[in-house]
């Protein structure tokens, strides 16, 4: 496997910091890395630009940045919620025969962090770790529907409404209308908007602060599940979403 030297060096810099070395001068880093200060300068500035390295204004020493704290909370939180959600997803897939997912928001995209394959609806394109367009998936709509106005506007600034099927929402206006409907009814639908032949429904997962931190979804094959059956599945999904939310401290 080819190694990208600049990336490896950047990671090695991050690994230098520990409980005994919370702050380091560039001369310290230079000695430990065996690199010139001029070479290190560009690496440190790049890490600093992206928030992974910070510089103490009082002494000029470098230290780990808050971006690592954010990423750490993201990883720990996703592991915890994944463990809690798996039981509900497994039971829902067993009862319905459909494929269920757990997704979270990461930047401008959703990400599947759990998937339980249904015996009656094998969804080949979905997998744990797959990134999801928020405008074209039920999970994506749920994950952004309850964001604050400023946060949502920032997320959608310059957003690309890529068309995946004839049913894909192709504009901000169409998406905003769908998000309003999602908030009103408490769930989102994806009717072949991301993948032809597949319909999905998703519901929010709330935490103890009454904030949406994830979404549960159920995916069906359009040819095998009619509207009435999908509505039944949606009700079961909503029950699972509420149960998981309460397990996470949601006060409802």
UniProtKB/Swiss-Prot annotation:
This is HTH-type transcriptional regulator XynR. Pfam families: HTH_IclR, IclR_C. PANTHER family: HELIX-TURN-HELIX TRANSCRIPTIONAL REGULATOR, ICLR FAMILY, HTH-TYPE TRANSCRIPTIONAL REGULATOR KDGR-RELATED. GO terms for molecular function: DNA binding; DNA-binding transcription factor activity; transcription cis-regulatory region binding. Residues 81-250 form the IclR-ED domain. The keyword DNA-binding applies. Residues 4-66 form the HTH iclR-type domain. Involved in regulation of xylonate catabolism. Represses the expression of both yagA and yagEF operons. Binds mainly at a single site within the spacer of the bidirectional transcription units yagA and yagEF. Residues 25-45 bind DNA. It comes from the Bacteria. Keywords: DNA-binding, Repressor, Transcription, Transcription regulation.
